[in-house]
Amino acid sequence: MPNKFIFLLILLVCMLAGAFYFSFEQSPSSNQEGAELGIAQGAKEVDVEDEINDILVPDFSNYKNVVKKKKAFFKYLLPEIRRQNDLLRAERKLVLAMAEQTSQGNDFTGAEQGLLDELRIKYRVGEELSSKDAVAELIKRVDIIPPELILVQAANESGWGTSRFAQKGYNFFGLWCFKKDCGFVPRRRNTGTVHEVAKFRDLSHAVKTYLHNLNRHYAYAPLRDIRYQQRQANQAVTAKALVQGLKSYSERGTEYIDELLSMMRVNKKHMGL
């Protein structure tokens, strides 16, 4: 086995060792609520852990100058966004190395097969697929999300970081959970529904969960297909293209997409990209 592949395997072992420290399983109880809100079932649903540490998020409402507030908001989020995308790039390198193995007709070692099995679970790739087909599907799922898209979604979903969900629980992305006391009970929750707005331990946990949700939930297969098509055409992965795959993120559908595109145009100069 090439030295490069050995290095990538070791790297992924380290990454996967912590992968299940974050729990992202979809709850079946999301079905009713997803239908009521007009979004894909469970599209914004994640599991989070009950124990929440002391929270320290900048109070963005203190900014009187709108431009300064926007710049501060982006500056706060961007380093963690870049860090999580770097982790995805490293994981993707291993998947691409696996794809090269399968294209050459080489069998995986026991260790390599074990890592593939872990990735199947992490990214919800079906056991019925052959190793070659599973790797092909992972190539679609293990990839970055452009920072520009993450930043405008965070701004849109959290009111530029001023919502109580962002301030008290690092939830900048409007993600839900369904375990009792896993988050905040919405003030306007419909009778008979049980969802809560998720709390996260820290910004890293929140961004990681958001990215994981986009990369494996069936509702965002259109986003992953757009991204894959750009990769196949040797094009840059762009926020403007991928945003078209987010119609299931909000009950507002196309109107939500148009709003995000408008936010990109107006705010790109403030992002520091």
Could you describe each region identified by the protein language model?
Residues P2-V152, N156-L273:
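Catalytic cores of secreted/periplasmic lytic hydrolases that degrade extracellular macromolecules
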